[in-house]
Amino acid sequence: GEILVHVITTSQEEHDLESLKEELLALPLEGKIVGIMHIINDSLSDVVQSDETRILYGQDFFYETLLGLRFKISTFSFFQPNSLAAEVLYSIVREYIGDTKDKVVFDLYSGTGTIAQLAASVADEVIGVEIVEEAVEAAKQNAALNNLSNCKFIAGDVLKVLDDLTEKPDVVILDPPRDGIHPKALPKILSYGVDHIVYISCKATSLARDLPAFLAAGYKLCLLYTS
């Protein structure tokens, strides 16, 4: 496979990155290094933020294949790092939503559109909503890469975008950030009254907070997968 290396430092120290680059390229790896990035991060945070990004070698992206589709992944794209586990997860999602060839699927908090594009192969239309504009542009590029014409990606807050959409979904897929679904967006999502909702949670406490609203709206918890 392809490997994109990120070297993260502060601007307060100098490093011999040329020697490091040569050492990395000489490593006997199973995959091929297609790019080495130098990310300067002076922020105090539990996530990497780029104050400046430089290409030391090659390119700033790589390609990953999931369930027959190809995705271009850049430095700050949101993408599941464990591709084998991601394939298991996405296969479960696709199997659960079932035959959707004549149906409209909403993928809310769609990131780079991975789930939306996997659903597009078994749906009439998929609409993805994501607040990060860079992720939406990546989703559009990947949809074109996979020759998918029935995907539409919208940049914006789910809370606001749902007010403007004229389409009505038959299936809703939710993959919110760690904080879960915005409390004001939940009633809008539930008002569609779709038969199937898939909630992919990356934080159990957020799921536990949101789940009672679904149960109160008449939904039943049919399947629960944990890892």
Model-derived features: positions:
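Rossmann-like S-adenosyl-L-methionine
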Residues: 16-18, 22-227
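Helix N-cap motif at beta-to-alpha junctions
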Residues: 10-14
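Short, aliphatic-rich beta-strand segments
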Residues: 1-9, 70-74
